[in-house]
Amino acid sequence: MLDIQQIQAIIPHRYPFLLVDRILEIEEGKRAVGIKNVSANESFFAGHFPEYPVMPGVLIVEALAQVGAVVLLQSEENRGRLAFFAGIDNCRFKKQVQPGDQLRLEVEILRARGSIGKGKGVATVNGELVCETELMFALGDKPAN
């Protein structure tokens, strides 16, 4: 299990774009399960939609990608690198996510060759499917300052 400080030591995302609160399970280089507690105070609810708050689907996909980045970047060989989003295939949204929901984010790395790879992401709320997608990624080095 990884807490928020451990997650922040692995991936560079920060508020308001850090969309993973905890990693519950992790198998190095293979898979992870994370959670995002969706609060009524999320900044995106101010405009999406004020009278009927719904978490934007693209942010659910981003949360899955961040869990995938933790899987990839927590290994010693990739520590200190960046994981870039390279593509999305077969993405489907099945249910709305609203304030008070807890998103369970499961990502499995399907294949990785060199710095390119693909994973499968599944997001659920209370055991009900919210989103499923295939995520492509590219690993890169951080630029020198």
Swiss-Prot record:
Biological process per Gene Ontology, one example term: lipid A biosynthetic process
A Pfam family annotated for this UniProt entry: FabA
Keyword entries, A-Z: Cytoplasm, Lipid A biosynthesis, Lipid biosynthesis, Lipid metabolism, Lyase
GO cellular component: cytoplasm; membrane
SUPFAM superfamilies membership: Thioesterase/thiol ester dehydrase-isomerase
Domain of life per record: Bacteria
InterPro entries noted in UniProt: FabA_FabZ, FabZ, HotDog_dom_sf
Annotated signal peptide: none
Catalytically driven reaction(s): a (3R)-hydroxyacyl-[ACP] = a (2E)-enoyl-[ACP] + H2O
EC numbers for this chain: 4.2.1.59
Cellular localization per UniProt: Cytoplasm
GO molecular function: (3R)-hydroxyacyl-[acyl-carrier-protein] dehydratase activity
Stretches that traverse the bilayer: none
Function per UniProt: Involved in unsaturated fatty acids biosynthesis. Catalyzes the dehydration of short chain beta-hydroxyacyl-ACPs and long chain saturated and unsaturated beta-hydroxyacyl-ACPs.
Family in the record: Belongs to the thioester dehydratase family. FabZ subfamily.
Annotated HAMAP family: FabZ (MF_00406)
Protein name: 3-hydroxyacyl-[acyl-carrier-protein] dehydratase FabZ
